[in-house]
C-alpha cells in the first residue's frame, strides 16, 4: 500500500471512531515543546494517532513520530489493563490504527535512528508528566511499567542495531538521515 493510501485509510478509521468507541474525551490543546500543539493527554489514544498522521502530512516528521509513539504507549496501557475500561471496539480501532499509521510513520522515523531513539525518550518523559485520567495508574501500575519497559527495550534495540538497520534501509532504497 502506498503511503498516501495508508494515511487515507487511517483517516477513514479515525473518522469512524465514534462508531467504534463512542464519545472521545478531550479536545483541548496543550503545547508540548518541541512537538507543537496537540490534544490534551486525557484524549483517547486514537486521537494521538490521528494527530501523528496530521503532523506527518504537514511535513513535521519528528512530531509525527512523537505522537505515534505516545499514542502507542497509551494504547498499550489502556488495552492491557482491565481496570481501564477498554472495549472490544477500542481494541479493534487501536489495532487498525497501529498497523496503518505505524506502517506509514516508522519508515520516516527510522531514517534517523538516533533521532527516533531520542524521541522515544521524550515520549517516556511526557508520559510521566501527563497522566491520562482514563487510566487508573494505581490499578494498572504493573501494566504501565511493563509497557514503558518495552519502549525502553525497543529504544535500546534500535540503538544497538543501528548500523544493520541503516544498511538494510540502503539495500531497500530507503534514505538515512
Give, region by region, the residue ranges found by the protein language model.
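Conserved small-residue packing positions in alpha-helical repeats and bundles
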Residues: 52-53, 69
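Hydrophobic/aromatic side-chain positions at a characteristic register within alpha-helices
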Residues: 56-57
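C-terminal motif of bacterial Sec signal peptides marking the signal peptidase cleavage site
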Residues: 17-18
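Bacterial N-terminal signal peptides that target proteins for export
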Residues: 1-8
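Long, low-complexity, acidic Ser/Pro- and Gly-enriched intrinsically disordered regions
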Residues: 22-40, 84-177
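Short, charge-rich amphipathic alpha-helical segments embedded
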Residues: 61-62, 66-90
